[in-house]
UniProtKB/Swiss-Prot annotation:
Protein name: Adenylate kinase
Cellular localization per UniProt: Cytoplasm
Gene: adk
Highest taxon above the source species: Bacteria
Record-linked CDD domains: ADK
Subunit composition and interactions: Monomer.
Keyword entries, A-Z: ATP-binding, Cytoplasm, Kinase, Metal-binding, Nucleotide biosynthesis, Nucleotide-binding, Transferase, Zinc
Annotated Zn(2+) binding sites: C128, C131, C148, C151
HAMAP family attached to this UniProt entry: Adenylate_kinase_Adk (MF_00235)
Organism the protein comes from: Orientia tsutsugamushi (strain Ikeda)
Role according to the record: Catalyzes the reversible transfer of the terminal phosphate group between ATP and AMP. Plays an important role in cellular energy homeostasis and in adenine nucleotide metabolism.
EC number from the UniProt entry: 2.7.4.3
GO molecular function: adenylate kinase activity; ATP binding; zinc ion binding
């Protein structure tokens, strides 16, 4: 691989990982596991039924499916750019798998945020039906009302996993499965904490400084 830098974004749903990845996409290739899983969910495959069942119940999708998605994405991505892994790994098993298959160093950024902020953000979230770009009815709508900034589509939808009851289940699952990664990566001196309660602009400045490529 010719990749110069890999940033791993981990944190609860709604912590702003996807927003920051989009803002950095000029210099980074983005692998958004959540976005890929939603694409799989909308496909006409047996795998789609499995993914849909887990996402609708607020649980993590099984690692055998998620790991396969990441490996395929790494094979097909533009390796002349640096990479952001958005939302992966989500548990210790996936973290071990990533280190075995990546075979190069990376930095882990943990987006730390209050549960109340997550609930407020996700309950107002919508996405473009055509390209999947995420907006928020409370603070981040398209520049032209009703028209996606990226693909000019006028079709938007509420995501199935952004229902309040499902959000709470996702947070519980995250705390159980993903929080142990903090100690895992802290012990390897890979971990940097990001206060995701801050403004988008302040978070972006910190990530740019950490990356060292701006």
């Amino acid at each position: 691989m010719r990749i110069s830098l890999i940033l791993v974004f981990i944190g609860p749903p709604g912590s702003g990982k996807g927003t920051q990845a989009s803002l950095l996409s000029e210099k980074f290739s983005i692998i958004s596991v959540g976005k890929v899983l939603r694409t799989v969910m909308e496909s006409n495959t047996a795998e789609a039924d499995v993914v849909k069942k887990f996402i609708k119940s607020g649980k993590l999708v099984p690692s055998n499916i998620t790991n396969k998605i990441v490996v395929n994405a790494l094979k097909n991505i533009d390796q002349c750019k640096s990479i952001i892994l958005d939302g992966y790994p989500r548990d210790i098993f996936q973290a071990d798998f990533l280190q075995e298959n990546l075979q190069m160093d990376f930095k882990v950024l943990f987006f730390d945020i209050d549960d109340a902020v997550v609930l407020r953000r996700l309950s107002g979230r919508i996405s473009c039906t055509d390209c999947g770009t995420i907006y928020n009815k409370l603070y981040c709508m398209p520049k032209i009302n009703g028209v996606c900034d990226i693909c000019n589509s006028s079709s938007f939808q509420n995501r199935v996993d952004d229902d309040e009851s499902i959000i709470k289940l996702r947070l519980e699952s995250y705390k159980k499965e993903t929080l142990p990664l903090l100690e895992f990566y802290k012990a390897q001196d890979k971990l940097t904490l990001i206060d995701a309660n801050q403004s988008t602009e302040n978070i972006l400045k910190k990530i740019k400084k950490i990356s060292g490529i701006y």
